[in-house]
Amino acid sequence: MFHATTILAYKGKNKAVIGGDGQVSFGNTVLKGNAVKIRKIHNGKVLAGFAGSTADAFNLFDMFEKNLEHTKGDLLKAVIEFSKEWRKDKYLRKLEAMMLVLDRDKIFLLSGTGDVVEPEDGKIAAIGSGGNYALSAARALDKFADIDEEELVKESLKIAGEICIYTNTNIKTYVLE
């Protein structure tokens, strides 16, 4: 598990949202509390976030964005092509990062081994050290609360930040409407 962050993605009825906390940890020390680990890519039509090694994640963002451009924004095709590249390349297989990517229609988790996972419910995914806490909170809020999509992500990440020592409550979100 990567002890650096928590990223949560949620695809609701009206909006797709990605959010992340701002903490960067090195061992048991907080190096930075306001890092931004999420992005809007492909002309703002796709949201992406990472957990793990920052340098590795930036390389993965760049590679994924090239695949997205090559597939003319088809997220499913882009993640499949990206996964194939990831698995074939000896250097990439050693990267210590995971990504979440989503658009208004699909959401995917890209693992550090090149696996592509679409969440079972098709709408909520989380990665990072506080990922399971954020995922649990998001599922509960999705099931029982009448709450805006962005607020659901913020509240879920806040709960994760209150529990996980590698996650803080300095939360940044991006929304696709």
From Swiss-Prot:
Domain of life of the organism in this record? Bacteria
- Keyword Kinase among UniProt keywords: no
Keyword annotations: Allosteric enzyme, Cytoplasm, Hydrolase, Metal-binding, Protease, Sodium, Threonine protease
Q: What positions does UniProt annotate as the active site of this protein?
A: 5
UniProt GO molecular function: metal ion binding; threonine-type endopeptidase activity
An annotated GO cellular component of this protein is: HslUV protease complex
Q: What class of enzyme is it?
A: hydrolase
For this protein, what is the EC number? 3.4.25.2
Q: What reaction(s) does this enzyme catalyze?
A: ATP-dependent cleavage of peptide bonds with broad specificity
Q: SUPFAM superfamilies from the entry?
A: N-terminal nucleophile aminohydrolases (Ntn hydrolases) (SSF56235)
* GO terms (BP aspect): proteolysis involved in protein catabolic process
Cross-referenced CDD domains = protease_HslV (cd01913)
**UniProt-listed InterPro entries:** ATP-dep_Prtase_HsIV_su, Ntn_hydrolases_N, Proteasome_sua/b, Proteasome_suB-type
What does this protein's UniProt record list under function? Protease subunit of a proteasome-like degradation complex believed to be a general protein degrading machinery.
Q: How does the annotation summarize its subunit structure?
A: A double ring-shaped homohexamer of HslV is capped on each side by a ring-shaped HslU homohexamer. The assembly of the HslU/HslV complex is dependent on binding of ATP.
What name is this protein filed under? ATP-dependent protease subunit HslV
What is the organism field in this record?
Campylobacter concisus (strain 13826)
Q: Which gene encodes it?
A: hslV
